[in-house]
């Protein structure tokens, strides 16, 4: 016993250290209330155990209770535990007796859980070799499947031959379906009821819902013979009643012939979608499917026109419950629909069926091998509200969190799964949960019991003397007072005490609503936010204002609802620093002389000033030039007139000081050119309040006034000199031009050569004119004389 307690002690110390304060703050007054706070909490049932005040101090972490003086054997802390009831070893190799095959371990266990805690257990699964197989062939016999029916006439023999390579114990059966034999799913004229294909013309069987034709058998020839004798039928709409048939094939276990220790394969063959759920309301069928077997003496579905089609959820429940693995063999056009169904149905697979079912054999073999290469767990039973999680550890040893399926397994490989179970709340009932591999009959049964009570609750002293002469019952180290009594030991009477002594004012709540009045005194409640204190529980250390989510800006202490700031901080929220280090600009001036330092930050007061230290100010000018008017007024004024400069200095934000005792290290040296061209120098400093002080104003290097006569004389002489120079230049230019013209004339004259002759310009003083008319008349006279 001592070793167990010592081990328990070290276990307590290591558990949940990060929540050690949560148990004591929960306000638990009984052991059971303490356990409900969390799995890390424990209760001290030791008599006369006190620490500080209040019954709630008995509830804490085991380590804290030990530190408070509670003896280890009085600490109530029930632990979650797993007890394995049945754990047969997994089967290895081929087994002669299929009933002795074990494919999951363990097989049964009990699990005791503390609310809020979790427990992890390991489940192992191994598929045994040469496991028996039952295959039920469920075929759509609507008119469009006529060629498929001819193709599978020898399927039984071929399938048995191929399956014999995989298992030595194989059986197969046959069933068919069309549609609910009711309008609007079929035509209801007498001729078409008798022969739905009369309009083709072709003979068809009357429309039927589901027919179970051949129970599971190992006689392949019998299967072939049954298939050869089948005839097609017909209906109106494209979706068929296949889900009705699946439901009956899954739940009619005895008539189908499903064995308990075999792999149940249901091959669904169709070229159309299937009705489900409330589709049958079109025919006026409103009674939900009950999930029961309704095969009559002829092995036909007798409730086809009475019950609705099953829903997907109902199919999942019955397929899982009866360990049936569904293989959808459908045409290419329907694959996308049935793939969606297969994602919801555990263990279901989908294969593409050729138009004439020519590949059905290969499809079945491939689906079987795929199913045998996968191990997937499913959880059944009372699982609502449980916290369940899985981690798969497949054949390569790699863990896959949040996964309960292993793929690409070989028959004989072992798949392990870590299953974590937790319950969030205390429950007065036990739960029964089943964990099983999909498609296998083996299962792990788990009985989950909540651990919500303490062992000390079994021992109760009614009207105990430990409770003030029998005024209460003593249990788990505390008194449960009888009516009319109160107090830790039931020492106070409710009738004899006034609650007024626990009120700060008559209109206030007792103990400010944050404590209990015991025997005229307030016992303040524990709070997860901090301490509640005061004679009336009126104070606390967590109700002060917050800055950026931090109590008192994390720079002060909360005392009775008000922030008391630490050194270096001020303000209602203690968020305002008194330091001015961040306000000093690079030149050492507080806020560059353009603002005030408030809460450690510069508030720029000069228009246009900005920046962390108001260093940017396009409209401000430099700090020296901004003081020009004040400085020039001070230098030009004498005596009483200097008082007139005070206003100008105020506008410039400065004060002139004659004191020489100041710190020159942080002073700014300024130089300005005055109106009289004198160089003005002065120093600028800043006092503790951020005000600008001007020191050491001096004026030097003033230029002498100009000599006006000398300037005028110089200007006159310069003008005269310029005139003389211009005249000389003009004279030189004229002389140069004349000389050039004379030289040109002399050159032309030297080139001239004169000859004697008549002057072409001379004319004589006389002129001779000849009368042309006179000569013509003389000629006429001569002619007349000759004629005569």
From Swiss-Prot:
Q: Name one Pfam family in it.
A: Integrin_B_tail
User: Which Cys-Cys disulphide bridges does the record give?
Assistant: 23-41, 31-454, 34-59, 44-70, 197-204, 252-293, 394-406, 426-452, 456-476, 467-479, 481-490, 492-519, 502-517, 511-522, 524-537, 539-560, 544-558, 552-563, 565-574, 576-599, 583-597, 591-602, 604-614, 617-620, 624-670, 630-649, 633-645, 678-702
Q: Look up the record and report any one GO term of the cellular component aspect.
A: cell surface
Write out the residues that bind Mg(2+).
140, 142, 144, 240
List the carbohydrate attachment sites: 48, 97, 260, 387, 418, 463, 471
| Residues annotated for Ca(2+) 1 binding in this entry | 144, 147-148, 271, 355
Residue intervals passing through the bilayer: 710-730
Q: Which residues form the I-EGF domain?
A: 456-491, 492-538, 539-575, 576-615
Q: Where is this region: Interaction with HAX1?
A: 731-758
Write one Gene Ontology MF term: virus receptor activity
Q: Which residues lie on this side of the membrane: Extracellular?
A: 22-709
Q: What is its main location?
A: membrane
On the Cytoplasmic side, which residues? 731-788
**Coiled-coil stretches:** none
In this chain the VWFA domain maps to 131-371
Q: What does this protein do?
A: Integrin alpha-V:beta-6 (ITGAV:ITGB6) is a receptor for fibronectin and cytotactin. It recognizes the sequence R-G-D in its ligands. ITGAV:ITGB6 acts as a receptor for fibrillin-1 (FBN1) and mediates R-G-D-dependent cell adhesion to FBN1. Integrin alpha-V:beta-6 (ITGAV:ITGB6) mediates R-G-D-dependent release of transforming growth factor beta-1 (TGF-beta-1) from regulatory Latency-associated peptide (LAP), thereby playing a key role in TGF-beta-1 activation.
| PANTHER family according to UniProt | INTEGRIN BETA SUBUNIT, INTEGRIN BETA-6
The text the record gives for the protein's domains is: The VWFA domain (or beta I domain) contains three cation-binding sites: the ligand-associated metal ion-binding site (LIMBS or SyMBS), the metal ion-dependent adhesion site (MIDAS), and the adjacent MIDAS site (ADMIDAS). This domain is also part of the ligand-binding site.
Q: Which family does it belong to?
A: Belongs to the integrin beta chain family.
- Provide the assembly information: Heterodimer of an alpha and a beta subunit. Interacts with FLNB. Interacts with HAX1. ITGAV:ITGB6 interacts with FBN1. ITGAV:ITGB6 interacts with TGFB1.
Q: What is the protein name given in its UniProt record?
A: Integrin beta-6
